[in-house]
Amino acid sequence: MKLINKIITLLKKNLILLFAVWLIIAIIIIPALSLAIVQGSVLASPDIDASLPFVGNLTYFISNPFLTLGYIFNPRFFGTYLETLKNFTGIYFLLVVFLAYKYEESKPYDGKEYGSARWSKNGEQYKILSKTSGIILAKDNYLPVDKQGNTNVMVIGGSGAGKSASFVIPNVLGLLGSYVFTDPKGELYDKTASYFKANGYDVKVLNLVTPAASDGFNPLLNADTPTDVDIITNTIIRGQDTGATNDPYWDNMAEQLLKALIYFLKATRGPEETNLTSCANLVRLANNSGNFNVVTDLMEILPPDHLARKAYKNVELATDKAYSSILSTLQSKLGKFESPEIAALTATNTIDFKDIGKKKTVVYVISSDTHTTYNFILTIFFSQMIQQLYDYADNNGGQLDIPTYFFLDEFANIGQIPDFDKKIATSRSRKISFNIVLQSLDQLEAIYEKTYETILANCDTHLFLGSNSFKTAEWFSKSLGEITIGKEQESKSKGKGEGSRRKYY
């Protein structure tokens, strides 16, 4: 029954082919074979040499099919033809049965049971990549900026893997639009700033290593909404470890007090006084004098329903002792803004984030690669920059005038940008590309514990330069997929004549 089923399956799948083979042989080979058997002597034709041997006649008749077909219905020949055809058909049927016995129905994934991944070959990668223009991934391999899907790239490479030399710096030459670079050592600025200037770019620098050489960045002047203020206060209070307290209550109260002070300054002071150093000065004044009514008296200038009064309400209710602790906590958090250099850097704004999307601009963000003292400023800087670019795009027909490319080397040093998983998921339509550079995936997970997989998934392109991180290597290995190199089958039979058989593929 199994053999019959195999025969039926073989016929269903190959009926036309089997019939075509039989028909060709029946019309061309069998007539020639029949004529060769009778040696052609029974046929009266000047074209046939009866003295030729069997093989010679067979060759002659096969090479002259039309002559051979002319003898099919010759009475002397037709009987031999039918007999030969009958014998052939029987042999052909037995051959079909044999093939059915050996036939194993092919399956869609035969030979691919464990995977079918492979490296591209013969230029297959150029179905997606370009040879001439776009974001440079490798020699003669560019990621087209107009490709379907996003142009976000995740670059992973350990220390010394060449992340800057082989990826970031080569992409400077493209001049594809505006650029934002994190520059941990300041080397990128030294090597490329003059090139951008020569090509008509506005060059801006946020320099946290040498603040005196930096453009101004005053986050309070960019805070246009309560959400903006929330990001600033949350980042300053929770984005730096001053060792002041382990009790979240004090951080919560310090954050509310800082909100109240920011809202107060924005409502009552001019741009030159609306900065975080002014906040630090007010806190120090109240804390050092022991006169806790200093801040309360300022707040009472404002209407009861003002945002500053609302934020200050819970702080105001604290006991003198608790109020003193709140002031001390906030003073420790704002201590860095009392540094003359940082005070000068954050006093003014000379970087208009929206200009990045309007005209060709390059921004270098230089920070220390040996300590994280000012990393919380980076978090605020990038949060505000990205949000303002998105806002400009949304009010400009849905996209920037100038495409903007972020090359974020040592991305982990920036800290957690609020809602970055949502930003990177919607960047393509706004003509924004994020190129994230890390030493390992562990760094990404440490900062974005709950959303790192979403961020990773929204980078359509992954560039792996090597890493000693097992988790990183394992992730890339699994992402590449598997290939079926071989398959072993073993079958065993029990009872009389017990044995086993193995097949290797």
Task: Specify the residue positions occupied by each region the protein language model found.
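Hydrophobic, aliphatic-enriched repeat segments that assemble into extended interaction scaffolds
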Residues: 1-2, 9, 13, 180, ...
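Glutamate identity and glutamate-enriched acidic tracts
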Residues: 83, 104-105, 113, 124, ...
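Intrinsically disordered, low-complexity segments enriched in small/polar residues
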Residues: 68, 132, 287-288, 493-497
